[in-house]
A protein has these predicted regions:
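ASCE P-loop NTPase helicase motor core
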Residues: 2-175
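Structural motif
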Residues: 86-90, 216, 261
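Conserved helicase motor core of P-loop NTPases
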Residues: 119-259
Length: 261
């Protein structure tokens, strides 16, 4: 299901049901951030799929483990499977085919595997479109959540995400105060307003620190590409300081205190 359709609520309901049945449950997601969100939303420990499968980067262990990409192996595999009655994977759209294969190898027959995700969200960085292909195959029981519930429906971000999926024009009435369009035609004005938003307006009205704010751009090069914007953001948010270490790499300066992704 898409944003605001109740995926997290459904996961919580399933956890409650299986706990009532006395089942052992494992929760996992493809990234650390997604696993952290899953833990916060459910109150149960979730971990990355790599951690669940006990990934190892030690070359000395490779002869004992299933190899999956770049010499890493997994301690959990067909010979040493996961012991659980139910495994719930969130953000399944980000799982690539190699990781999914490793997960399937480590699951015992009879284990319930529940995959949750939004096929229109972030795809996997690695090969394959596992969630989309599984859905298109119709080989497994599948439930699609379509209704946007009241709280999520009050967010213009959620509403516009669904409008875009339906091929409709986005709405800019901004009732929820979380979706803004500022039209600017001058590059220098864009720079100025970007810094104002990050240093003053968003911290004042939303309570976000500059470190909590992420600037996105569809380009790497050019006056509005990430290389130029990063240089400008660094100049204002993390200026040169004799007490901060820095390292130049080509035309880029990496400085202590920079935000790194």
């Amino acid at each position: 299901g898409g944003p605001g359709t109740g995926k997290t609520t459904t996961i919580n309901a399933m956890i409650h049901f299986f706990e009532e049945e006395g089942a052992d449950i494992l929760l996992a997601a493809p990234t650390g951030r997604a696993a952290k969100r899953m833990t916060e939303a459910t109150g149960c420990e979730a971990q990355t799929i790599h951690r669940l499968l006990e990934v190892s980067g030690n070359p000395e262990d490779d002869d004992k483990r299933d190899k999956v990409g770049f010499g890493n192996g997994f301690g959990r595999n067909a010979e040493n499977p996961l012991e659980s009655d139910v495994i719930i994977i969130d953000e399944m759209s980000m799982v690539d085919i190699q990781l999914f294969q490793a997960l399937l190898k480590a699951i015992l027959p009879g284990t319930r595997l529940i995959l949750v995700g939004d096929v229109d969200q972030l795809p996997s960085v690695g090969p394959g479109q596992v969630l989309r292909d599984l859905m298109n195959s119709r080989a497994f029981p599948m439930v699609t959540l379509e209704k946007i519930f009241r709280q999520a429906g009050q967010s213009d971000i959620v509403v516009n995400a669904h409008r875009i999926n339906r091929g409709e024009q986005i709405t800019l009435d901004n009732k929820s105060k979380d979706f803004f369009l500022l039209e600017r035609n001058d590059v220098n004005v864009i720079y100025k307003h970007m810094i104002q938003l990050i240093q003053d307006m968003l911290p004042r009205y939303v309570g976000a620190t500059s470190f909590d704010i992420q600037v996105l751009t569809p380009m790497r090069k050019g006056s509005l590409g990430c290389e130029t914007l990063n240089e400008i953001l660094q100049r204002y948010l993390n200026p040169a300081d004799p007490h901060k270490k820095e390292h130049a790499y080509g035309n880029t300066v990496f400085r202590e205190g920079d935000k790194v992704m």
